[in-house]
Amino acid sequence: VARRGARKQTPAPSRLILDSGAVIALARGDQRARGFIERAIETGCEVLVPSVAVAETVRGRGPRDAPVNRILAAIDSVLVADEAAARTAGDLLGATGTDETIDALVVAGAILAGGGRILTSDPANIKKLARATPEITVHRV
């Protein structure tokens, strides 16, 4: 029985956050990565890429980067690494004793977006950084 005046809780939208390894896997036609994207589309899941993953994967706009640029053009949004993300990443690095700044910025972006699933080719580092954040799950591409 709902209390009178109580606001109905709505779940946070589902998010799929792609790190650079996931973007590269998609650009190469990796079937496992495509499966994650297909399920995201089927379920209305928002697909995001941190700006640091864009920097890691793009080397120009020429033919060599065409597959990566096609993937990035289809993404719902880019998670910008602003001061809040940088500070959150710094907190994660301090709490875990790691020095994987790019991975920390990926996790920080996911935290600030409200959680979600991170698709990565390097789950060990991402899991370590996200271990205290239950609203984030990590999946290997």
Features from the language model and the residues they span:
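Short, well-structured N-terminal submotif of metal-dependent ribonuclease cores
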Residues: V1-V49, V58-D76
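Alpha-helix capping/helix-boundary segments
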Residues: A22-V23, A53, A85, L105-V106, ...
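Short beta-strand scaffold positions
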Residues: V49, V80, T101, T120-S121
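Acidic, metal-associated active-site segment
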Residues: T57, E100-R117, N125
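Short, polar loop motifs at secondary-structure junctions
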Residues: G62-P63, S121-N125
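Acidic catalytic patch
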Residues: I75-T96
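Short loop/helix-cap segments at secondary-structure boundaries that form the rim of catalytic
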Residues: I126-T133
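Short hydrophobic/aromatic-enriched beta-strand-loop microsegments
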Residues: E135-V141
